[in-house]
Regions:
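Structural motif detector for alpha-helix initiation sites
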Residues: 35, 99, 220, 289-292
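Short amphipathic beta-strand starts and helix->beta connectors
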Residues: 214-219, 245-249
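Short Pro/Gly-enriched coil loops immediately N-terminal to beta-strands
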Residues: 81, 227-228
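Short acidic-hydrophobic catalytic motif
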Residues: 221-225
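Non-catalytic alpha-helical coupling and interface elements of nucleotide-dependent molecular machines
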Residues: 108-111, 204, 250, 297, ...
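ABC-family P-loop ATPase nucleotide-binding domain
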Residues: 1-17, 302-351
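ABC transporter nucleotide-binding domains
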Residues: 6-210, 216
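Short, charged/small-residue-rich alpha-helical element at the C-terminal edge
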Residues: 228-302
Length: 351
């Protein structure tokens, strides 16, 4: 497990564990979400992410350990909607209730002014859909309405569980811009995902879990630095070139099994110059770019590795005869959102 200490925590998990009968969902999980960060909570499906988020929010009682939100247990916060906005599932919207009425109901429940409902519709770009029933909304529109609900209390923290699921690229881009703008206002985001590439462009920190345990936490900058591009060099005397490079301060050098050396932190021109000075002939050089998604998969590999010849797991298999592909979900366009803390976004509504 690799752990890097960071700034003060908006959210802190301390030894969280959860046992569901014979299933150990989370085991001794500890991590922090720094204040003002966008932290990606990453892991394969079934790795304990949703259970952990629900424990943080007091929706599931942990078997062991505890957690803190802004320094205190969540259940002790007097006005939780003003501290934490939660986006767990957009399927809980009443299909016969309009977007505006939905927000008014929740505004009344948490004790904020009725006018806040219209403001939040404007914030997420749903003003023109205020009088439409939620049951007619596309997945992207439902997700925006769920975010508007979470924002009613003007929270300091947003917690989102797999918010990109089912969204098309335009919807994902809108969500990314929205969360970046929220964090730029000095607030904190914890967003879960089973794919690093979905959140890589917006997160500043990552917490990676597998089988309900921590495998990595730290900043994205540190993760990128640890897996930066390398120059793979084939030459007449690898050992001599490595020694010459080390003398110039280039120490990220690895001897590969095929006789080449992998060099980090030096550009081709520098390596060529050092090789010439050391009287080493370079036969070829190629830059190896590291795919962070592959790094993430390596961290979490093995969680669901299938046994050879195992076929379908019990209860799973081909659908019975007569079941076709699911129908396409209609995507209704809406006007572009306007987000006051960083200005209008480019492009249209969700899909």
């Amino acid at each position: 497990v690799s752990v890097q200490m960071g700034p003060p925590a908006a959210i802190e998990a301390r030894g969280l564990s959860k046992q569901f009968k014979t299933v150990r969902a989370v085991t001794d999980l500890s991590f922090t979400v720094p204040l003002g960060s966008i932290t990606g909570f990453l892991g394969p499906n079934g790795s304990g992410k949703t259970t952990t988020l629900r424990m943080l929010l007091g929706l599931v009682r942990p078997t062991g350990g505890d957690s803190r939100i802004l320094g205190v247990p969540f259940h002790t916060i007097e006005e939780p909607a003003r501290a934490v906005g939660v986006v767990l599932d957009s399927r809980g919207l009443h299909p016969a209730r309009t977007a505006l009425d939905h927000l008014r109901v929740y505004a009344s429940a948490i004790g904020v002014p009725d006018g806040r409902a219209a403001q939040m519709l404007h914030l997420v770009g749903l003003t023109e859909a205020a009088d439409r029933k939620a049951g007619t909304f596309s997945l992207g529109m439902r997700q925006r309405l769920t975010i508007a609900t979470a924002m009613l209390g003007d929270p300091q923290i947003l917690v989102l569980d797999e918010p990109s699921n089912g969204l098309d690229p335009e919807g994902i881009a809108w969500l990314r811009d929205f969360l970046i703008g929220f964090a730029r206002s000095g607030r904190t985001v914890l967003v879960s995902s089973h794919l690093l590439r979905e959140v890589e462009q917006m997160v500043s920190h990552v917490v990676v879990v597998s089988r309900g345990t921590l495998v990595h936490q730290g900043s994205m900058d540190a993760l990128r630095a640890a897996h930066r591009a390398r120059l793979l060099v084939s030459c007449s005397d690898p050992a001599r070139l490595a020694t010459a490079l080390a003398a110039t301060g280039v120490v990220d050098i690895q001897h590969l099994a095929d006789g080449r050396i992998a060099i980090g932190g030096a550009d081709p021109a520098t390596v060529g110059h050092v090789a010439a000075e050391a009287d080493v002939t370079v036969f070829g050089a190629v830059t190896e770019h590291v795919d962070l998604e592959q790094v993430f998969l390596a961290m979490t590999s093995g969680q669901y590795a299938a046994a050879p010849g195992s076929g379908f797991a019990p209860g799973y298999g081909p659908p019975p005869p007569g079941y076709g592909a699911p129908p396409a979900y209609p995507q209704a366009p809406i006007p572009p959102p306007v987000q006051p803390w960083f200005g209008p976004t480019n492009g249209g509504g969700p899909r």
